[in-house]
UniProtKB/Swiss-Prot annotation:
Transcription factor that plays a role in the activation of archaeal genes transcribed by RNA polymerase. Facilitates transcription initiation by enhancing TATA-box recognition by TATA-box-binding protein (Tbp), and transcription factor B (Tfb) and RNA polymerase recruitment. Not absolutely required for transcription in vitro, but particularly important in cases where Tbp or Tfb function is not optimal. It dynamically alters the nucleic acid-binding properties of RNA polymerases by stabilizing the initiation complex and destabilizing elongation complexes. Belongs to the TFE family. Monomer. Interaction with RNA polymerase subunits RpoF and RpoE is necessary for Tfe stimulatory transcription activity. Able to interact with Tbp and RNA polymerase in the absence of DNA promoter. Interacts both with the preinitiation and elongation complexes. It comes from Haloquadratum walsbyi (strain DSM 16790 / HBSQ001). Pfam families: TFIIE_alpha. Keywords: DNA-binding, Transcription, Transcription regulation. The winged helix domain is involved in binding to DNA in the preinitiation complex. This is Transcription factor E. PANTHER family: GENERAL TRANSCRIPTION FACTOR IIE SUBUNIT 1, TRANSCRIPTION INITIATION FACTOR IIE, ALPHA SUBUNIT. GO terms for biological process: regulation of DNA-templated transcription; transcription initiation at RNA polymerase II promoter.
Length: 176
């Protein structure tokens, strides 16, 4: 996938937005070709230098940017020259999908193996053992704890897991 195609993909835009937030999005959405300093980016984009640096370091932490330091011979100051590596985005997204799949599978097992009770007035859900310790009364409101069915949540999680497995081409059993 070409660099420009990546940046036009709404999934990629959402991913970058989740990483750097709204203030860092101008940095993430308009990466220059070649090396650039944080000061040049701040000036070019009309942003605060700290916002640019924050976005750059987040991109760096996610393997989407690298830097090299150059010391100015006259002043002794270090200049950071940044290069963007958005070719790593598809791999990063796939890793995120695997993490999500693992978390959903773990949560699904938890939901299946526990019975829950709800304090409707407080909007708090308790496991059976907690509810029993509390005498089936909400500690905040004193309202009785009512058993709740979580099958809809389980079904939704199963659908999402199936969808992720299909996208990742994993965990799908094939009949022979």
């Amino acid at each position: 996938m070409a660099f420009d195609e990546l940046l036009n993909d709404p999934v990629i835009q959402k991913y970058l937005h989740e990483l750097v937030g709204p203030t860092g999005m101008p940095v993430a959405a308009a990466p220059p070709d070649g090396e650039v300093t944080d000061e040049e980016l701040a000036e070019e984009l009309g942003l605060e230098l700290n916002d640019v640096r924050r976005a750059l370091f987040i991109l760096y932490e996610n393997d989407l940017a690298t830097y090299r330091r150059v010391r100015d011979e006259d002043s002794g100051w270090l200049t950071y020259l940044w290069t963007f590596h958005y070719e790593n985005i598809p791999e990063n997204l796939q890793s995120e999908m695997y993490r999500l799949l693992d978390a959903l599978e773990e949560r699904l097992e938890y939901e299946r193996s526990h019975e829950f009770y709800l304090s409707e007035p407080a909007g708090i859900r308790f496991e059976f053992s907690e509810a029993m310790e509390l005498g089936f009364q909400c500690p905040e409101t004193g309202a009785p704890l009512e058993p709740i069915e979580n099958q809809e949540m389980i079904n939704a999680m199963e659908r999402r897991i199936d969808s992720l497995q299909s996208e990742l081409n994993v965990g799908v059993t094939q009949t022979v």
